[in-house]
Amino acid sequence: MTPEEMLNEITDLKKKVQRLEDIEAIQYLQRAYGYYLQHYMAEDLTDLFADHEETELKIAAGTFKGKEAVARLFHQGQSGQIDRFQHPKFLHQVMQLSGVIDVDPDGQRAKGRWYGFGANAFPKDDGKVNPGWMNGIYEVEYIKQGGVWKLLKVRWMMIFHAPWTISFVPAEERQDMFMNRPYNPNNANKPTDAPEETQWPSGFIAPFHFTNPVSGRKTDVTCKWKGGSKVF
């Protein structure tokens, strides 16, 4: 390898490492957003957004352009009921899951897509609390300012919000039924050594492909509860 070829390879490796570091930083940023959103921590949420002319947050309540508008939303909420967010039983969990991130070639901007899923608890004026589940998609644009990745544009698209007892399909279309599990082992599409499946929590532990990252020990998955007895 010539000195020139070696220099080119080093340059290429530096670019690859930088891209991986950018992706890691963006993941950290997005996950922090989810944790702050759980309790509507307005100051922390606002800090994650870039101070930029393109800064934008788009949700069902509307489009909030500029960092100041984003800050007003997080401080006041959609209807100005700040007391609700400070209620000890308020919960707005939106786990940031399955992120797919693409960094621009110049390393200054990026885009990401995430699932948002979690449990909610919204205190009501009558003293009761409205629990539910929510699921949606985030499409996010990021920008690097001063070497720090920040949120530039966040779009939240709700897929469903379901009250705790009603499920996430319309009542008139809902039909509760049990799946036939475990499936028929004689089914030609399922070999006899296929993994176990259960309808309810049963003590079944899905096998791990990896060993313990600290001890290197293979994880024991043979421990199960059956008929009230522990089986090894």
Predicted regions and their residues:
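Terminal "cap-and-tail" regions of soluble proteins that handle hydrophobic small molecules
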Residues: 1-27, 145-232
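Short, aromatic-enriched amphipathic alpha-helices that serve as compact interaction elements
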Residues: 22-38
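A solvent-exposed, acidic/Ser-Thr-rich amphipathic alpha-helical stretch
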Residues: 42-118
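Hydrophobic/aromatic beta-strand elements that line small-molecule binding cavities or substrate pockets
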Residues: 97-101, 137-143
